[in-house]
Amino acid sequence: MKQKYSKKSKKWIYITTIIFILILDISSKHLIIKYIKTYDTKKIFSVLNFFHVHNHGAAFSFLSDQNGWQKWFLSTVSILTILVMTRIITKLKKQETKKITAYSLIIAGATGNLIDRIFYGFVVDFIDIHINDWHFATFNIADCSIFIGIIILMRINYST
């Protein structure tokens, strides 16, 4: 009985995290598509714009200049990532909530960007952080989720 409870608790943590991030990611991208034309910018703060772009590649537009094969390649990588991370979560102990949360964030981000690739053929990016004329790569909430998940895992793995 105790093991079933542990598995249910573990599932609850990661399912809730994934759903929450997916809702944020999908709804934010929907609002960007609806209210900001592609390549238009809306200033939010002095260092933050919403800049609507379509990324046909991966992080930092890697592979975006290819002729379309990257959509299938990156979708396959996303699916494999989701499956591997889900398997890892099922093997973790209930007490390893930081790891469960980190893997859940990565799954959520990979799923959010996979949904874009399947439905649009590209990933919708819009968060533009800048200082004067210097702009960091444009990204989205799914990318933030992946990044935060990786940082958490690095802290866990390198702090012991």
From Swiss-Prot:
<feature type="transmembrane region" description="Helical">
    <location>
        <begin position="72"/>
        <end position="92"/>
    </location>
</feature>
<comment type="function">
    <text>This protein specifically catalyzes the removal of signal peptides from prolipoproteins.</text>
</comment>
<keyword id="KW-1003">Cell membrane</keyword>
<comment type="similarity">
    <text>Belongs to the peptidase A8 family.</text>
</comment>
<keyword id="KW-1133">Transmembrane helix</keyword>
<dbReference type="GO" id="GO:0005886">
    <property type="term" value="C:plasma membrane"/>
</dbReference>
<keyword id="KW-0378">Hydrolase</keyword>
<keyword id="KW-0812">Transmembrane</keyword>
<keyword id="KW-0645">Protease</keyword>
<keyword id="KW-0472">Membrane</keyword>
<feature type="active site">
    <location>
        <position position="125"/>
    </location>
</feature>
<protein>
    <recommendedName>
        <fullName>Lipoprotein signal peptidase</fullName>
        <ecNumber>3.4.23.36</ecNumber>
    </recommendedName>
</protein>
<dbReference type="Pfam" id="PF01252">
    <property type="entry name" value="Peptidase_A8"/>
</dbReference>
<dbReference type="GO" id="GO:0004190">
    <property type="term" value="F:aspartic-type endopeptidase activity"/>
</dbReference>
<feature type="active site">
    <location>
        <position position="143"/>
    </location>
</feature>
<feature type="transmembrane region" description="Helical">
    <location>
        <begin position="104"/>
        <end position="124"/>
    </location>
</feature>
<dbReference type="GO" id="GO:0006508">
    <property type="term" value="P:proteolysis"/>
</dbReference>
<comment type="pathway">
    <text>Protein modification; lipoprotein biosynthesis (signal peptide cleavage).</text>
</comment>
<feature type="transmembrane region" description="Helical">
    <location>
        <begin position="13"/>
        <end position="33"/>
    </location>
</feature>
<dbReference type="InterPro" id="IPR001872">
    <property type="entry name" value="Peptidase_A8"/>
</dbReference>
<keyword id="KW-0064">Aspartyl protease</keyword>
<keyword id="KW-0997">Cell inner membrane</keyword>
<feature type="transmembrane region" description="Helical">
    <location>
        <begin position="134"/>
        <end position="154"/>
    </location>
</feature>
